[in-house]
């Protein structure tokens, strides 16, 4: 999982070696990235396409059309340019995930209001609710709303719903 995210967000051999910790050299980490790109060429094509779009337009776009601009995408300074490229790769993915959770929050509100339940917080891709003990009547409808808030074509969005007396003890 770490390798999937790391490659998708443009990690270098140096960066991956640091993430993997002791026992992995920069060369070994770079070889892992190379093997990953050879095994999953569509991922490399996708990320390369995002960078090309950012270079051509100066921005990337989420699935809902929000733009993020990258003024340093053509910077003469290599470090600044590569940072902008990594941001450009990240923006459509993270931005679309943010769009998805915000849409879910909006769409789940009528369900919550119908029962007097409260949404306590949103953390990355999680929503946390306070509900009466023993009342799980809206758990499945909320899960379904979250799975369908923003469809990704043929790619299923899977949502786990957990209930517990506190955040630590969710099951």
What do these predicted regions represent?
Residues 1-171:
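Conserved catalytic core of nucleotide polymerization and phosphodiester-bond processing enzymes
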């Amino acid at each position: 999982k770490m390798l999937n995210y790391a490659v998708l967000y443009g990690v270098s051999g140096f960066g991956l070696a640091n993430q993997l910790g002791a026992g992995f050299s920069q060369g070994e980490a770079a070889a892992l990235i190379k093997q990953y790109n050879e095994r999953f060429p569509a991922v490399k094509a996708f990320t390369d396409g995002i960078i090309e779009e950012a270079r051509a337009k100066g921005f990337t776009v989420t699935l809902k059309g929000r733009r993020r601009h990258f003024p340093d995408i053509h910077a003469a300074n290599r470090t600044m340019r590569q940072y902008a490229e990594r941001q450009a790769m990240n923006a459509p993915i993270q931005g679309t995930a943010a769009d998805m959770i915000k849409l879910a929050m909006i769409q789940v509100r009528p369900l919550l209001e119908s029962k007097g339940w409260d949404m306590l917080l949103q953390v990355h891709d999680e929503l946390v609710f306070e509900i009466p003990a023993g009342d799980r009547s809206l758990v499945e409808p909320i899960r379904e709303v979250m799975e369908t808030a923003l469809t990704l074509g043929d790619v299923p969005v899977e949502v786990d719903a957990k209930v517990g007396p506190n955040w630590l003890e969710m099951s």
